[in-house]
Amino acid sequence: MNLKPLADRVIVKPAPAEEKTKGGLYIPDTGKEKPMYGEVVAVGAGKMSDSGQLLAMPVKAGDKVLYGKYSGTEVSVEGEDYLIMRESDIFAILA
């Protein structure tokens, strides 16, 4: 992937949507819920503080993160779907 986020932005590869229910029924594309977690694939340099210092990003490539249902902007690069979001849109790092 040739995509480098700027400032405090993060690129996340969303987890795949569930294909079937726990009971074994297949879910059509129109009924699938958007996943709210994924893997960070790239991180910007960070945000500038009011005093001019560069604040380090708390997430890094490879982290599994939890984010809001409507967070980020969807982009497709080389046939793969990604979300570009601000670091503040990420709720937690999954351990």
UniProtKB/Swiss-Prot annotation:
The keyword Ribosomal protein does not apply. Disulfide bonds: none annotated. The keyword Chaperone applies. One of its GO terms (molecular function) is metal ion binding. It comes from the Bacteria. GO terms for cellular component: cytoplasm. InterPro entries: Chaperonin_GroES, Chaperonin_GroES_sf, Chaprnonin_Cpn10_CS, GroES-like_sf. Keywords: Chaperone, Cytoplasm. Transmembrane segments: none annotated. CDD domains: cpn10. GO terms for biological process: chaperone cofactor-dependent protein refolding. It is found in: Cytoplasm. Heptamer of 7 subunits arranged in a ring. Interacts with the chaperonin GroEL. Belongs to the GroES chaperonin family. Together with the chaperonin GroEL, plays an essential role in assisting protein folding. The GroEL-GroES system forms a nano-cage that allows encapsulation of the non-native substrate proteins and provides a physical environment optimized to promote and accelerate protein folding. GroES binds to the apical surface of the GroEL ring, thereby capping the opening of the GroEL channel. HAMAP family: CH10 (MF_00580). This is Co-chaperonin GroES. The gene is groES.
